[in-house]
Amino acid sequence: MDVSDLLDGLNDKQREAVAAPRSNLLVLAGAGSGKTRVLVHRIAWLLGVENCSPYSIMAVTFTNKAAAEMRHRIEQLIGTSQGGMWIGTFHGLAHRLLRAHHLDANLPQDFQILDSEDQMRLLKRLIKAMNLDEKQWPARQAMWYINGKKDEGLRPKHIESYGNPVEQTWLRIYQAYQEACDRAGLVDFAELLLRAHELWLNKPHILNHYRERFTNILVDEFQDTNNIQYAWIRMLAGESGKVIIVGDDDQSIYGWRGAQVENIQRFLNDFHGAQTIRLEQNYRSTNNILKAANALIANNNGRLGKELWTDGSDGEPISIYCAFNELDEARFVVNRIKVWMENGGALNDCAILYRSNAQSRVLEEALLQTSMPYRIYGGMRFFERQEIKDSLAYLRLIANRNDDAAFERVVNTPTRGIGDRTLDVVRQTARERQLTLWQTARVLLQEKALAGRAASALQRFTELVDSLAQETSEMPLHVQTDRVIKDSGLWLMYEQEKGEKGQARIENLEELVNATRQYSYQDEDEDLMPLQAFLSHAALEAGEGQADKWQDAVQLMTMHAAKGLEFRQVFIVGMEEGMFPSQMSLEEGGRLEEERRLAYVGVTRAMQKLTLTYAETRRLYGKEVYHRPSRFVGELPEECVEEVRLRASVSRPVNHQRMGTPVTQNDSGFALGQRVRHAKFGEGTIVNLEGSGDHSRLQVAFQGQGIKWLVAAYAKLETV
């Protein structure tokens, strides 16, 4: 392959990373620096220039979408399909490994993946069965505890309670949960990684096989790896494996779910002779945006250090707007987007970012009032929707009768007269006899241990599942799926729901059938039946959003959801102390720097225009709370920002009670355009009025002090 084909169009540092000798390497890649391109060209370099076998390459990404895109781009660059490479997420690759060695991993061949919702259901049932107070020992907290311990590589036997009764109870729940999973052949996401790691620990011959095979390992988004993922990669590499990691310590924003930004430094310490190449040239943002991002993140300690730059223009200054409250903030953002549209801009080039989902409501209302289409990015995902979960549960039960989570979900869906009392008997008997729920149901029916009506209903359910399994086993996957949805009664149940919601559910069921029709085997699924392969695919995809057809609509999302995206115009709202950085980060040591990294991620999403807004007052928990501007606003260099001021003519005032309705005077005794004097801020002009009586508020543009909102009853303003 011609070397120039792989290096043309790359900058000097990108070329250096692509053509680096085969050794351990950290590519410290700043936002918008073309890291994906570097990874793709590096793999193509290994194949086309170094003549490495595709079978020697493992590439780890953090989403299935990124893995599919990487494989596609490599094949486009090389010009041929490259089978044999392992490209996927940590969970996907661990799943592939466990499927190939299920006996050595002490798993049944048809083991099923338990997603977070099913994990929660199982834990709720176990906590109830253990006679624990579900409020004191919530299933969500138990899930967090168990997953956290697994991410650290810890089984119950490895955890010391030190006589702490709280820790002892969590350990009991962990133990009971794991025993239930083992009985039913269920593996949760954290278990995939832990068991894959244990497989290599306990079976050195298997580890050695993969060490000899995968001599070229590449890992993307390394700042987001947790302890077990780091240990997994380190064990696979051994002493002779060559590992390239790509990451950015300044974009590590998932510490709350176990990510260890320190893993980048651990890599430099643990992997012999590891070198560092910095990608600092940015191809996304203007110079002003990059200067602001650099200044912001420079306030964090312990960084590996890099300075983003561009050979593009300075662009517009970053706009900062001080709103009176969240209503004013939303109005301002919507009006700015209107101006963008009037100047020929597309709505889908505009993104509104916020720290938490709760902030979206007021923004949505403002957009609705102006009939401006919008989309909540990262909303309910396809495989997490109720009707899809129900359908998959039937399919899972057909594939594996011992799947307790699937049994629990559909045994009375649609309603068929199997009540909680009957299910409690089944659960209790299952615990006593150490059986799965399906096995227990069959035993109780054989022993005639259930009341007549309940027994009949349970009998009909087991016969339904058995008949569906038998009659559809030879059908194409999409025909099988359609048959199960119809014969189980799910289609009719949701069809009877009527209205837009019912129609949406039916459309989703149709889309599930389409998904099974379009599903194609991956090479790692060659030993699985079609249904088992698709169920594994669905479980692995459940954590990733299914994008709707892209429309011209404003994009609303949290800053976490925005990572990896870019927009021409970005608004970051709620830039207030206690909102962003969050109150929790201010109260807990070590969290503030991750909040600043999150702000850095938000700022670097903007390509052309960035606007930051904060409100002086915001209604929280039913009360109006006063906030100071976020420290992150104060950390931006003055030469890169501009404060947005209302026009001096005050020709278009706004009443925040009825957005868009002009108000020129209220019962406060003040009027728009009036000159006033304040003891602290000096002279200014009233540019806005809001409220009435004791709640009357004034927005005043002070000379040299900016725009301030004041409560008329307390401001002690003098007319000039």
Which residues make up each language-model segment?
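Structural signature of nuclease core domains in nucleic-acid processing machines
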Residues: 1, 240, 562-579, 584-587, ...
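Conserved RecA-like helicase ATPase core segment
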Residues: 2-7, 39, 44-48, 227-329, ...
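Conserved helicase NTPase motor core
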Residues: 3, 8-19, 23-28, 38-39, ...
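Inter-lobe coupling/hinge region of RecA-like P-loop helicase motors
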Residues: 3, 7-10, 15-28, 55, ...
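Conserved glycine(s) of the Walker
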Residues: 34-35
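Conserved RecA-like ASCE P-loop NTPase motor core of nucleic-acid helicases/translocases
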Residues: 53-64, 85, 220, 246, ...
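Conserved P-loop NTPase-based nucleic-acid remodeling module centered on helicase motor cores
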Residues: 56-145, 150, 157-162, 321, ...
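Conserved helicase C-terminal RecA-like lobe
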Residues: 159, 163, 346, 360-372, ...
